[in-house]
Amino acid sequence: MGAGLPAIAAALIHPARRVLAVCGDGGFMMSSQEMETAVRLKLNLVVLVVEDNAYGMIRWKQQADGFTDWGLTFGNPDFVAYAASYGARGSRVTGADGLAPALEAAFNAGGVQLVVVPIDYSENIRVLSGELSKLTAGPGRKAWD
């Protein structure tokens, strides 16, 4: 967690390429201050924040192992305003059909762009812990055992 935004290095090394950092909201907040660095260096970087107001992937793993959900939810700042506070530009996607156009607009705009998209990991729990486990691990075993 927290390793997505350091994609700044890719933007430094390959300034002509499209660089996309994909971060969960919890992981993003662990290194979000690096947006200042990206803005100061005038990088072209798109940061996609998938927002569920929780450590969603940790929740999925804990639920898959039968643990009670505890201490995994949190409140987020207004990410669009947060991006603006660093001199970046932010936008919010409200549905899946808006994601591709929002990313394309962010890449075309240049500079540091933050795109926030809500996500519901509950489908992951059903598919990854149930259906995929049965297909990949065999009867009675979890895929990560």
Predicted regions and their residues:
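Thiamine diphosphate
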Residues: M1-D145
